[in-house]
Amino acid sequence: MLLSQNVSAIGPLNLYPMVHISLVFGISYVVPDLSDESCTLKMRFRNFQSILSWELKNRSIVPTHYTLWYTIMSKPEDMKVVKDCINITRSFCDLTDVWVNRTDMYISQVVGYRENAVVVSCMGSFFLASDKPLDPPKFEIVDFTNNISVNVKFRLDSPRIPSEELQFYLAFIEEHAGNSVKRHQPQITGNITENFNYVIDKLIPNTNYCISVYFEPKDPRKINRSPLKCILFRPRRESESSEPATIGGILILFLLAAVCISTVMILKRIGYICLRNDFPEALNFYKLSVWVFPELPPLEKMATVEVIHITRKKKEWNYNYDDESDIENEVAPRVNSGGYTKHGLTGRLCPTSTTAASLEDCSLEDCSLEDCSDPSAEEPYLPEPKRDAETPAAPGPGPWQSEGTGGGYQTRGTLWQDPTSEEDSDSTEGSEGRIVFNVNLNSVCVRALEDDKDSEVTLMSPSPPEETAVLEEDLSETESSLLVASEEGTQLPFTDPSMECLRPQDALSDKSDTSESDVDIGDGYIVRQVNLKNFN
């Protein structure tokens, strides 16, 4: 704030009493106006420089040049001219190096000349401690991570002012944050250098702060504040805050994607997009929804299964090839102690003198006895027309055997012709009185009856010792059950199944002479060829 003082020209002798009063009471003395007020004197203190300026009241009188005089009131001295302010054309003068004592009162006189004539003369008195306000210094503010630094600058050519006096003038740094104002009073000790730094901390992030620096004089009404300098305080720099910005961007993108997907799915559900079931692949989010919300696996289908055990009775066959009757003569099965059942097989031999018709009738009669129900027997067995002897019934396995292992029958006793017999069909010697059948060596025991009645039973397959004992016990019983084929035809019984083998008897009668030859065809079977002589 500038101080203006109206001065008038007075004599040096009249100033001494006023100087004494000014020093005692410490007040500024205003020199009484002893002449007409032709100009106004002003003292300024800018950047530690004392500038005295003047302004003319009567603008019609314009001096061409000025000269400045001064004296100290406490010293009985005459007026002295200021060397740098003689015959100057400007309306101010720098008294920084002239007025150095701040406790003295200085009396100044400005004289204006036009050519060599004095046209204006003005006087004034100033007490530097109170009448010279200080202009605010230059400063800068810098923001850091958590504070603000205020850098106050002083000129190198500053006046020679002691540090104690500078502490008196350097007052406050004001901090403006919104509507609040906070003053900081720095503590200065020692000599003052070019710059002075002051740190302001405990700041609120993302807040705009304004700083002002000024010197406070004794009169509060004369404070001259500097212009405000503002800065936005950020606790972190932009480089450090890049990571939160990235995370925020990712979250925003994720939310936008979720909103878009949910919108499309809702439009699909309500049928707004399209009304067909085969959607394009771009709009098919079923798999994506399964990944986010997995569905429970479907329940297993269960059905009740009822197991029904069917008990089937074994069909017993009584093969009877009698000419007089086609009815099966059932023979009561004999149950052995081992739980097996004996079955007899009635075999019929074709007559000696046979013709093609008689042989055909014989084969048809055999088929009628068997009901021709065996699916494996595709063609009926037709005996060769040159056979002269009746073929005796050959023993075969019982009906409990699933495989067709019967001697001359297929599965249920039907005779079948071995390929080997077809090869020998051209020879009259091998085709007469011969029957071809298979024997399972794993389950059949064969006893061949030769001319000697004392021949022993020959076992064709091994059997355990227990089964051999049972075989010997039932030997007599088996021999009694064997029947010899006669003209009417007899029944050839099977052996006991508990023996796990069959013992066929090949002796048909005393008049029949048999010769046997066996051929192994693999799979545990043997082809037996029996040569039969013609019966009388």
UniProtKB/Swiss-Prot annotation:
<keyword id="KW-0472">Membrane</keyword>
<feature type="repeat" description="2">
    <location>
        <begin position="363"/>
        <end position="367"/>
    </location>
</feature>
<keyword id="KW-0732">Signal</keyword>
<keyword id="KW-1003">Cell membrane</keyword>
<dbReference type="GO" id="GO:0035455">
    <property type="term" value="P:response to interferon-alpha"/>
</dbReference>
<dbReference type="GO" id="GO:0005886">
    <property type="term" value="C:plasma membrane"/>
</dbReference>
<feature type="glycosylation site" description="N-linked (GlcNAc...) asparagine">
    <location>
        <position position="87"/>
    </location>
</feature>
<feature type="region of interest" description="Disordered">
    <location>
        <begin position="487"/>
        <end position="522"/>
    </location>
</feature>
<dbReference type="GO" id="GO:0035456">
    <property type="term" value="P:response to interferon-beta"/>
</dbReference>
<feature type="modified residue" description="Phosphoserine">
    <location>
        <position position="480"/>
    </location>
</feature>
<keyword id="KW-0675">Receptor</keyword>
<dbReference type="InterPro" id="IPR015373">
    <property type="entry name" value="Interferon/interleukin_rcp_dom"/>
</dbReference>
<dbReference type="Pfam" id="PF01108">
    <property type="entry name" value="Tissue_fac"/>
</dbReference>
<keyword id="KW-0677">Repeat</keyword>
<keyword id="KW-1015">Disulfide bond</keyword>
<feature type="transmembrane region" description="Helical">
    <location>
        <begin position="247"/>
        <end position="267"/>
    </location>
</feature>
<feature type="glycosylation site" description="N-linked (GlcNAc...) asparagine">
    <location>
        <position position="191"/>
    </location>
</feature>
<feature type="glycosylation site" description="N-linked (GlcNAc...) asparagine">
    <location>
        <position position="58"/>
    </location>
</feature>
<feature type="repeat" description="3">
    <location>
        <begin position="368"/>
        <end position="372"/>
    </location>
</feature>
<keyword id="KW-0597">Phosphoprotein</keyword>
<dbReference type="GO" id="GO:0060337">
    <property type="term" value="P:type I interferon-mediated signaling pathway"/>
</dbReference>
<feature type="disulfide bond">
    <location>
        <begin position="85"/>
        <end position="93"/>
    </location>
</feature>
<protein>
    <recommendedName>
        <fullName>Interferon alpha/beta receptor 2</fullName>
    </recommendedName>
</protein>
<feature type="disulfide bond">
    <location>
        <begin position="210"/>
        <end position="230"/>
    </location>
</feature>
<dbReference type="GO" id="GO:0004905">
    <property type="term" value="F:type I interferon receptor activity"/>
</dbReference>
<dbReference type="GO" id="GO:0042018">
    <property type="term" value="F:interleukin-22 receptor activity"/>
</dbReference>
<feature type="modified residue" description="Phosphotyrosine">
    <location>
        <position position="340"/>
    </location>
</feature>
<feature type="repeat" description="1">
    <location>
        <begin position="358"/>
        <end position="362"/>
    </location>
</feature>
<comment type="function">
    <text>Together with IFNAR1, forms the heterodimeric receptor for type I interferons (including interferons alpha, beta, epsilon, omega and kappa). Type I interferon binding activates the JAK-STAT signaling cascade, resulting in transcriptional activation or repression of interferon-regulated genes that encode the effectors of the interferon response. Mechanistically, type I interferon-binding brings the IFNAR1 and IFNAR2 subunits into close proximity with one another, driving their associated Janus kinases (JAKs) (TYK2 bound to IFNAR1 and JAK1 bound to IFNAR2) to cross-phosphorylate one another.</text>
</comment>
<dbReference type="InterPro" id="IPR050650">
    <property type="entry name" value="Type-II_Cytokine-TF_Rcpt"/>
</dbReference>
<feature type="compositionally biased region" description="Acidic residues">
    <location>
        <begin position="420"/>
        <end position="429"/>
    </location>
</feature>
<feature type="disulfide bond">
    <location>
        <begin position="39"/>
        <end position="122"/>
    </location>
</feature>
<feature type="region of interest" description="Mediates interaction with STAT2 (and required for the recruitment of USP18)">
    <location>
        <begin position="432"/>
        <end position="456"/>
    </location>
</feature>
<dbReference type="InterPro" id="IPR013783">
    <property type="entry name" value="Ig-like_fold"/>
</dbReference>
<dbReference type="InterPro" id="IPR036116">
    <property type="entry name" value="FN3_sf"/>
</dbReference>
<comment type="subunit">
    <text>Heterodimer with IFNAR1; forming the receptor for type I interferon. Interacts with the transcriptional factors STAT1 and STAT2. Interacts with JAK1. Interacts with USP18; indirectly via STAT2, it negatively regulates the assembly of the ternary interferon-IFNAR1-IFNAR2 complex and therefore type I interferon signaling.</text>
</comment>
<feature type="topological domain" description="Extracellular">
    <location>
        <begin position="27"/>
        <end position="246"/>
    </location>
</feature>
<dbReference type="InterPro" id="IPR003961">
    <property type="entry name" value="FN3_dom"/>
</dbReference>
<dbReference type="Pfam" id="PF09294">
    <property type="entry name" value="Interfer-bind"/>
</dbReference>
<feature type="signal peptide">
    <location>
        <begin position="1"/>
        <end position="26"/>
    </location>
</feature>
<feature type="modified residue" description="Phosphotyrosine">
    <location>
        <position position="525"/>
    </location>
</feature>
<keyword id="KW-1133">Transmembrane helix</keyword>
